[in-house]
């Protein structure tokens, strides 16, 4: 097989994987490894679903500073922060707009590991991330108005209590009063958000409810040297999962589905996401835009059928705010598991994570699950590795003869190439025979890299001794040092490149990679260390026991 054919095989294989993956995602195929989510029944109460998508534009949604009211000469009331606590959340609701202004996720430790916390929603001088709602279509209550807590009582989920409800009432504006109720359920990262619209005026009203996520472009908990997606995302049955880059919003060039009666909108970051999930069947417009030099929003606008005087309408929605755990996400809403983004290797990464999860269920430790999965993958690919290492061993055996031929014919490149080709033919050696078996394995190992990088299950997960968190770098750099040593050993087992420059590069590569791996999450470095050690063992066994060839004089 010559180099052209090898390159063609590589291009064909990678293209096939990418095309099939895109086809899978564009058609919203359910996971082969997890249960499919069930659709939520369409809205039926109070005409909340509306009759058609509103024609208003995203610019009509109030865009005053996130969570802050525009200046007025005589503010009607002073906003307050209402603190609450559940088994999975600590948070604050700002009475200005009844906005979910702070939300800290809690992960209980097991006694050996401490509790883990991450603040998802926040509104400080250095970071803004909010979930808010309001009404459009008139001078109706929105996120700039100060609400009043209704029936103020306990704000903590205690004892045998299964749910915590917090309600907030708006001032009357345009003949409309809004009562917003948050329902927090024990053990759940899904928050029920009910918007009750009362027409207390003398004329019918046709408001539109907006639900949006607002945040800046500040990345949090992103590993050094590793890029993960940060920004809005939209899911609809028509276009399926669409990521929106902040840079596209900067240029007003974002391309996404603008109207639907299904799906959700989200803000995605490393390990965690939030998503507004309106009722299925309720028509809505979808918008995403930049509203400040470093502030963005994504949301939906859901029209409400006409409400007669003295009548009311309920608009129910769900707000997910939590970790990107695949099994949980699959059960919440169709396509929500896609916020855990594996990129173009999704088709391979999802089964790998499924297998990793099964192994973890057996051994009870994510570190050992990584080790065992790596061993299993190496065992599956052993025949391909054997073919590659045999070819490399043969090349190593004839390297002295190749160098002698290059020295003999260095002044005549044509004769040198002819002599080398004759040597390959005589010894039945393909100089590129070790490439294709390795290339075929590359997508699998890249996929496993993304599985370990994207899986929130690694966060706070210990392995042994000094490794207390597989999502953080090795505190004593022991694994990166082992990684560097294994790379040096592996390099020494390979044939020495005839080109002195290439030879120096091969010696320098372990150093360069080791510098990066010093800052990689420990789980990723563990995978590479185990993979390298197994590769060294395989290569040693094959070259010494199976691929031995007697040296022949030049």
Curated annotation (Swiss-Prot):
Membrane-crossing segments per the record: 7-24, 362-382, 436-456, 475-495, 510-530
Q: List the disulfide bonds.
A: none
Q: Could you mention a single GO BP entry for this protein?
A: protein insertion into membrane
Q: What is its main location?
A: membrane
Keywords from the named record: Cell inner membrane, Cell membrane, Chaperone, Membrane, Protein transport, Transmembrane, Transmembrane helix, Transport
The question of whether Iron is a record keyword is answered with no
Localization annotation = Cell inner membrane
Q: Which Pfam families does its entry note? A: 60KD_IMP, YidC_periplas
Membrane topology annotation: Multi-pass membrane protein
CDD domains assigned to the protein according to its UniProt record, in alphabetical order: 5TM_YidC_Alb3 (cd20070), EcYidC-like_peri (cd19961)
A Gene Ontology cellular component where this protein is annotated is: plasma membrane
Q: Which family does it belong to?
A: Belongs to the OXA1/ALB3/YidC family. Type 1 subfamily.
Its function? Required for the insertion and/or proper folding and/or complex formation of integral membrane proteins into the membrane. Involved in integration of membrane proteins that insert both dependently and independently of the Sec translocase complex, as well as at least some lipoproteins. Aids folding of multispanning membrane proteins.
Provide the protein name.
Membrane protein insertase YidC
Q: What gene makes this protein?
A: yidC
């Amino acid at each position: 097989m010559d180099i052209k054919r090898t390159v063609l095989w590589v291009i064909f294989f990678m293209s096939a994987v990418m095309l099939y993956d895109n086809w899978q995602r564009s058609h919203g195929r359910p996971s082969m490894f997890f249960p499919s989510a069930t659709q939520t029944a369409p809205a039926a109460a109070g005409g909340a679903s509306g009759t058609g998508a509103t024609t208003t534009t995203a610019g009509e949604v109030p865009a005053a500073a996130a969570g802050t009211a525009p200046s007025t000469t005589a503010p009607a009331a002073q906003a307050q922060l209402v603190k609450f606590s559940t088994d999975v959340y600590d948070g604050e609701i700002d009475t200005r707009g009844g906005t979910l202004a702070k939300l800290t996720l809690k992960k209980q430790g097991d006694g050996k590991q401490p509790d883990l916390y991450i603040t998802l929603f926040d509104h400080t001088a250095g970071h803004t991330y909010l979930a808010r709602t309001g009404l459009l279509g008139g001078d109706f209550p929105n996120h700039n108005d100060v609400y009043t807590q209704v029936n103020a009582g306990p704000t903590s989920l205690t004892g045998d209590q299964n749910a915590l409800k917090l309600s907030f009432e708006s001032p009357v504006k345009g003949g409309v009063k809004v009562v917003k109720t948050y329902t927090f359920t024990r053990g759940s990262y899904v928050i029920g958000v009910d918007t009750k619209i009362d027409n207390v005026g003398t004329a019918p009203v046709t408001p539109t409810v907006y639900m949006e996520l607002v945040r800046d472009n500040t990345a949090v908990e992103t590993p050094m040297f590793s890029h993960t997606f940060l920004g809005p995302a939209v899911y609809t049955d028509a276009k399926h999962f669409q990521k929106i880059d902040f840079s596209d919003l900067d240029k007003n060039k974002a391309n996404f589905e603008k109207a639907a009666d299904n799906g959700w909108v989200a803000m995605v970051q490393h390990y965690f996401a939030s998503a507004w999930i309106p009722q299925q069947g309720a028509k809505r417009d979808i918008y995403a835009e930049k509203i400040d030099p470093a502030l963005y929003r994504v949301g939906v606008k859901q029209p409400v059928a006409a409400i007669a005087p003295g009548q009311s309408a309920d608009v129910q929605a769900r707000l997910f705010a939590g970790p990107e755990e695949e099994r949980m996400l699959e059960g919440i809403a169709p396509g929500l598991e896609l916020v855990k983004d594996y990129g173009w290797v999704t088709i391979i990464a999802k089964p790998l994570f499924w297998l990793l999860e099964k192994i973890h269920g057996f051994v009870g430790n994510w570190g050992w699950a990584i080790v065992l999965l790596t061993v299993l993958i190496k065992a599956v690919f052993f025949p391909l590795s054997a073919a590659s290492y045999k070819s490399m061993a043969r090349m190593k055996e004839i390297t002295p003869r190749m160098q002698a031929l290059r020295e003999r014919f260095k002044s005549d490149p044509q004769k040198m190439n002819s002599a080398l080709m004759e040597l390959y033919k005589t010894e039945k050696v393909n100089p590129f025979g070790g490439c294709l078996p390795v290339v075929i394995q590359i997508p699998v190992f890249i996929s496993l890299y993304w599985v370990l990088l994207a899986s929130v299950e690694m966060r706070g997960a210990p392995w042994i001794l000094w490794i207390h968190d597989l999502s953080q770098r090795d505190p004593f750099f022991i694994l990166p040092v082992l990684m560097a040593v294994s790379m040096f050993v592996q390099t020494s087992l390979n044939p020495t490149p005839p080109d002195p420059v290439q030879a120096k590069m091969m010696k320098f590569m372990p150093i360069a990679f080791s510098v990066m791996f010093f800052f990689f999450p420990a789980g990723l470095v563990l995978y590479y260390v185990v993979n390298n050690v197994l590769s060294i063992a395989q290569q040693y066994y094959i070259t010494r026991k199976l691929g031995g060839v007697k040296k022949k004089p030049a």
